[in-house]
Amino acid sequence: MKYLASFRTTLKASRYMFRALALVLWLLIAFSSVFYIVNALHQRESEIRQEFNLSSDQAQRFIQRTSDVMKELKYIAENRLSAENGVLSPRGRETQADVPAFEPLFADSDCSAMSNTWRGSLESLAWFMRYWRDNFSAAYDLNRVFLIGSDNLCMANFGLRDMPVERDTALKALHERINKYRNAPQDDSGSNLYWISEGPRPGVGYFYALTPVYLANRLQALLGVEQTIRMENFFLPGTLPMGVTILDENGHTLISLTGPESKIKGDPRWMQERSWFGYTEGFRELVLKKNLPPSSLSIVYSVPVDKVLERIRMLILNAILLNVLAGAALFTLARMYERRIFIPAESDALRLEEHEQFNRKIVASAPVGICILRTADGVNILSNELAHTYLNMLTHEDRQRLTQIICGQQVNFVDVLTSNNTNLQISFVHSRYRNENVAICVLVDVSSRVKMEESLQEMAQAAEQASQSKSMFLATVSHELRTPLYGIIGNLDLLQTKELPKGVDRLVTAMNNSSSLLLKIISDILDFSKIESEQLKIEPREFSPREVMNHITANYLPLVVRKQLGLYCFIEPDVPVALNGDPMRLQQVISNLLSNAIKFTDTGCIVLHVRADGDYLSIRVRDTGVGIPAKEVVRLFDPFFQVGTGVQRNFQGTGLGLAICEKLISMMDGDISVDSEPGMGSQFTVRIPLYGAQYPQKKGVEGLSGKRCWLAVRNASLCQFLETSLQRSGIVVTTYEGQEPTPEDVLITDEVVSKKWQGRAVVTFCRRHIGIPLEKAPGEWVHSVAAPHELPALLARIYLIEMESDDPANALPSTDKAVSDNDDMMILVVDDHPINRRLLADQLGSLGYQCKTANDGVDALNVLSKNHIDIVLSDVNMPNMDGYRLTQRIRQLGLTLPVIGVTANALAEEKQRCLESGMDSCLSKPVTLDVIKQTLTLYAERVRKSRDS
């Protein structure tokens, strides 16, 4: 099988790409910060440049104004010159003008010639200059005006202000400029000349402008002006600490107002540029260089770089801090994302890959075939070796059918018989694999299972046949055993009703006991067989648990008295008066437990305690017998198990009684438990659910309230039960210790009273008393310990109180025996067995009934046609015409007389079949005289009522 490509490499690459993404994000933030800072820097540079330009405009205006003054003065000077003599002709002079001061500029300068030759002109010009000074010089801020002759090289100084002049410095500067001017090319000699000399303090100097004066196209003189220049006037008011420097055409500093650390020198980068803005070498200063036309001078404004960055320094720090924090955050986020996403994902991928490989190895080594088929065409995409082998075993038709089933998606499995007779079961589920609709198929070789199912089916058929044979065996055995046994028990029962010679009655009793034991053994075996074959059914109906317990104790009390034991029956007041269940099976279970208790108890007593336990009715049977070892308690309810090898083996039994009890209680939705200790006795507890329980009204006997009863009872359990029962009836209960009673008091005791009781009566509970309470002498009553719950009824009789009870089980039975008067009833006995037919006739005769007999169903119909019959008592299984067909024929004839079936069949369906055929009831053989009496009394009363109506 091919393994899927690992995607751990993809996850690792994704992890590194995530790191790269974090780095790119950080770089993006950094570039954004740099861009923002650069933009802020450019904005700051733009502001500084704008301020530089505004300041340079002031310097430009200063130069331009001086140039304009030069033009005006030149115009004045040229217009004042006389074209004839080359001197100025004063016009309208009112006073004598002062002669200007003359200064030689060179060693060969002839100031006397200039003074003599141009005296008149200079005086006229001086007068005009004085006039111009008085009216205009203040506006132009001029210090002096001077005129230099072109031939004599002597300077005539027209001072406009009284300002000290450094003569040597000024003459030296003029000397240098005159030489430069004289040596300049012909084209440049006609232009103006500008220069600045340093002043008395930094930032203050003298600005000189020199222009040629021509007369008749001939250079006659050079006119110049001197003006004080203050660099501080070239700044705009503001907070920017800028420096300013004026350079000549060679880049030499003429005047500067800067700090000592910033000395501006001409930079070749911007010397030839009219305007240049940028940083100096080393990025120490930001400068703006602009020419100052019409002069050849240029002005340079500068500001230190740290001043430029001062306003954005905090922005830079914030940007650096932001980038550091962003980098740390991105790195932390990347690391956290790796630890929480990528690294676990890589671990999961590794585990998933290992799991995938492990699953594939499991699939490859699986004992079944596993494959993936494409849904569209059934092509095998992936499979293990076993599936490949199985698929090759399929025929072409099988593959087509499998493909159709997969495409249809109607079923999830299909059984296929291969060409070599191998049974394959193919189950599948639909899924997606590699972007295709597929079916995951599992192929299992079920040949062994098919063979096993066939074998099991054969075994089931054999078991069903065996069950049918077992049912037939039960029916046959039940009929064949119960039929002769009924003849034995029934005749012995009849024989005991006769007067027998002395000694014969003992033999008859022994025979009756033995036959009863045989009947019990046979009944247990048949019941167990019916339970095992699920033939036994629970028949729920409403019954009184109190009556069932009274009936059980009445049946076993003679046996208990015979063994000189005590049988205490405590029925608590909370026991319901009626509930839904099977009273016959409950009686069978309790009778079995009580019989075992009597059997295994030689001394002491047996206690039957009935009470309500929540939603259950609890029935406890406790004895003081030999007990059961703990190791054998766990097997106590196993079939055919008998306890021990010692004294218990001395008791007869099949070992089926408790097993049957456990099965019956389980069928009634109850449970049974045992608690035993060797030498101390055993206690069996049966619990059945209280279905449809009806409880008595909680009220005492009217008339007994306030009566006093004295208790002198040695048995603690009996004493406690009597005290509770009497107090519930409103009786005052007092322990008797020899006190003097009142005439209305009653003494209740379980021992012989030594002296005469002075009260109303004495009730003695005796273990050997059987039957209803008996008055041996006036005021002296004997009561059975098996029915202490009947004591309130006896007290009502003693106090002559008429008792009304909603529970007849607590009432005292009538002492008068009913006289049998049944000779008005004609009963037809139908049985093919002559002994049983004769026995039934004798039993009916002993009960006072009139009787006719018939051999089978045909004979019975003949008798019915000729005689009046009130009740039909018929066997079920007979030749010619059985009891079922006889009943159906009777109903077809329109006869409504009661038909009672008698059968020896032990199956549960037998009674149901009898009822379905039309019978009113069904009795199981052997039928005792008491059962016949109870049944016929019921139906005879019904017939009499029908006659009367």
Curated annotation (Swiss-Prot):
Residues 357-425 form the PAS domain. The chain crosses the membrane at residues 20-41, 314-335. The modification 4-aspartylphosphate is found at residue 875. Signal peptide: none annotated. GO terms for cellular component: cytosol; outer membrane-bounded periplasmic space; plasma membrane. Residues 42-313 are periplasmic. This is Sensor histidine kinase RcsC. It comes from the Bacteria. The lineage of its organism: Bacteria, Pseudomonadati, Pseudomonadota, Gammaproteobacteria, Enterobacterales. Component of the Rcs signaling system, which controls transcription of numerous genes. RcsC functions as a membrane-associated protein kinase that phosphorylates RcsD in response to environmental signals. The phosphoryl group is then transferred to the response regulator RcsB. RcsC also has phosphatase activity. The system controls expression of genes involved in colanic acid capsule synthesis, biofilm formation and cell division. Residues 1-19, 336-949 are cytoplasmic. It comes from Escherichia coli (strain K12). The Rcs phosphorelay may be activated by RcsF. DjlA, LolA and OmpG might act as a regulator of the phosphorelay. Activity is probably up-regulated by YmgA/AriR, and possibly down-regulated by YcgZ, all 3 are connector proteins providing additional signal input into signaling system. One of its GO terms (biological process) is regulation of DNA-templated transcription. The modification Phosphohistidine is found at residue 479. Keywords: ATP-binding, Capsule biogenesis/degradation, Cell inner membrane, Cell membrane, Kinase, Membrane, Nucleotide-binding, Phosphoprotein, Transferase, Transmembrane, Transmembrane helix, Two-component regulatory system.
